[in-house]
Amino acid sequence: GRDPHQSEQLWEEMYSETILHGRRGSVIRAISAVDMALWDLVSKAAGLPLNRYLGGPEIDTVPAYASGGYYAGGKTLEDLAAEMCRYIEMGFTAIKIKVGRLSPEDDTLRVKAAREAVGPDIPLFLDANNAWKDTNSALEAIGMFEEYDPGWIEEPLMPDDIQGHAEISRSVRTPVATGEIHATRWDFQQLIEAN
């Protein structure tokens, strides 16, 4: 019974009711589901895709990268390289592989194999999935990967370690990507302020 055009006010009302339930996990996801449904409703009512409703340009395509390079028993460097080549053959213009589960030396061999398979012009992203437990371990590994020009290193530490991510960002030339589990503007404000 509320006006869906007031999605920002409705979000604030829902969020203010979460103080006793926690502002993480399923509570925030539920608010997000309602919020997305409201934006979808008003943009469809206007006869526009959401990006146009919000004033963005008309777009025909969205760039996508292939996320692969998972660790699998028996997977060789040659298998990894072949997998990367298949993604390029499928039309992807960038790829992402997992790192952090092996020693820095062994993971560097994986990064090298992926880079050599796709060449220097294809962006190669690395996803550590919070693999390193301290900044020094992350810096050691990332320092070894940098020879292969990664486009970014994703989630090198636990997501809550904002200062650790900031220290890594200041210490390496590879951009640090983080925030996939963060859910509110306040979370992202902390990340931005920490650089």
What are these regions (language model features)?
Residues 49-54, 79-86:
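Short, charged beta->alpha transition segments
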Residues 97-195:
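Catalytic core of soluble alpha/beta enzymes
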Residues 39, 65-67, 71, 92, ...:
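Tryptophan-centric aromatic hotspots in well-structured domains and transmembrane helices
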Residues 83-98:
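Catalytic domains of carbohydrate-active enzymes, especially glycoside hydrolases
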Residues 2, 6, 26, 30-31, ...:
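Catalytic cores of large soluble enzymes that bind and process phosphate-bearing ligands
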Residues 62-81, 99-100, 128-134, 177:
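Active-site mouth loops of central-metabolism enzymes
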Residues 1-45:
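Metal- or metallocofactor-binding catalytic centers and their adjacent structured scaffolds
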Residues 51-72, 119-123, 170-172:
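N-terminal small/glycine-rich loop or linker at the start of catalytic domains
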